[in-house]
Regions:
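Structural core segment of the AMP-binding/adenylate-forming
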Residues: 1-50
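Adenylate-forming
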Residues: 11-26, 169-185, 221-233, 247, ...
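Conserved pre-ATP/AMP-binding loop-to-beta segment of ANL
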Residues: 32, 53-76, 83, 108-114
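Conserved AMP-binding A3 loop
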Residues: 72-98
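Conserved AMP-binding/adenylation subdomain of ANL enzymes
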Residues: 95-114, 121-224, 234, 259
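Conserved AMP-binding
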Residues: 118-123, 242-244
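Conserved A3 ("GATE") glycine/threonine-rich loop of ANL adenylate-forming enzymes
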Residues: 167, 242-249, 261-269
């Protein structure tokens, strides 16, 4: 792609990248998001904070016009045999993906949402759902410090949309059930009734009677509200992608009044 500038997030990746970059004639400048130890003078390495401190006239900078078919990024596939393969995505392919994603919400357009991003941005799923989609809908992106602090960060920022992989939802599902199983028999029975009524509401609305609605409402005050707090106080829905979400997990959250939207696609598209 003949890139002349590279952005590197941390020192660990810098050490890997610089081994190849020192022998690459195209790369002239490297901007790092952490201070790194680089004493050679082969490349110009700049810590991003140093750029912000300079009071230069930003009008000097200009952006070249791009065509839809120009390369926008290269994402390396995971889970394939042999070495990872670099997939070149054009501006057109990313925009088409965004148009399709935004069209899903045509009845309730996304605007000024609050996303929390914690998946690797080197994956096409998070590239779209966690980065480009928020930007395209004038929304905010909050980046989690790390996976261990994810739920602390969720409480801090109260996202309206959370994008994750099935594995996370499976872990939450198991944790909720384990906590319920530690309760007395009455609580366990009430929770099962709550799930059953939620499932009926989701799958068979015709047989969802008025009495069911009343019981479900009362039980939701006991269970649903507490469970929803795991995801903050402003959650609208969850997004699942990067793998298949089992029906069991999906219906579990839907039964608790937590909407999960499922996405799918290939890195190559």
């Amino acid at each position: 792609c003949n890139a002349k500038l590279a952005f590197i997030s941390n020192e660990r990746l810098f050490k890997i990248f610089i081994q190849a970059a020192d022998n690459n004639k195209n790369i002239k400048n490297i901007i790092t998001f952490e201070k790194v130890n680089y004493k050679k003078k082969i490349k110009k390495v700049t810590y991003i904070e140093e750029i912000f401190k300079k009071k230069e006239n930003t009008n000097k900078f200009s952006i070249d016009k791009k065509n839809n078919d120009d390369e926008a990024c290269i994402i390396y596939t995971s889970g394939t045999s042999g070495k990872p393969k670099g997939v070149v995505l054009t501006h057109k392919s990313i925009l088409a993906n965004l148009e399709g994603s935004i069209d899903v919400f045509n009845k309730s357009p996304l605007k000024n949402e609050r996303f929390i991003s914690f998946l690797p941005l080197s994956h096409s799923y998070e590239h779209t759902a966690g980065q480009f989609l928020p930007v395209a809908t004038s929304s905010q992106i909050f980046y989690a410090e790390n996976l261990e602090k994810l739920f602390i960060n969720i409480k801090e920022v109260n996202p309206t949309i959370i994008s994750a992989v099935p594995r996370l939802y499976e872990a939450i599902y198991k944790k909720i059930l384990n906590n319920i199983f530690k309760k007395n028999n009455l609580i366990q029975k009430l929770f099962k009734i709550n799930l059953k009524l939620g499932k009926t509401k989701y799958e068979d609305k015709k047989n969802y009677r008025l009495s069911d609605k009343i019981i479900k409402f009362l039980l939701s005050l006991i269970f649903d509200k507490k469970i929803k707090k795991i995801f903050g106080s402003k959650l609208k829905f969850l997004i699942s992608g990067g793998g298949a979400l089992s029906y069991e997990i999906n219906i579990f959250f839907e039964s608790l009044g937590i909407k999960i939207l499922q996405g799918y696609g290939l890195t190559e598209t």
